[in-house]
Amino acid sequence: MRQVLVYPGEDDYWVAECPSLPGCVSQGKTREEALVNIKEAIEGYLVALETDHLPIPEEHFDALLVAV
């Protein structure tokens, strides 16, 4: 399981990224599409790491909300 950030991007697209996997970013026309796309991106990222015999990064982020 991986934490994913989803937020509105440019041109009415949604951006999704996985902070524990550097460079693992995707987008979609809707929030739901962005989530589907980032899931595929994460799966591909992990397969590439395994294929290249590279270590799979641990999930190491805490999500916090800060009142300002």
Where do the language-model regions lie?
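Short, charged, surface-exposed hinge/linker loops at domain edges
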Residues: M1-L5, E32, V36-V68
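Short aromatic-glycine-(Arg/Gly/Cys) micro-motifs in beta-strand/loop hairpins
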Residues: V6-L21
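A short, exposed loop/beta-hairpin motif centered on an aromatic-Gly-Thr core
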Residues: P22-R31
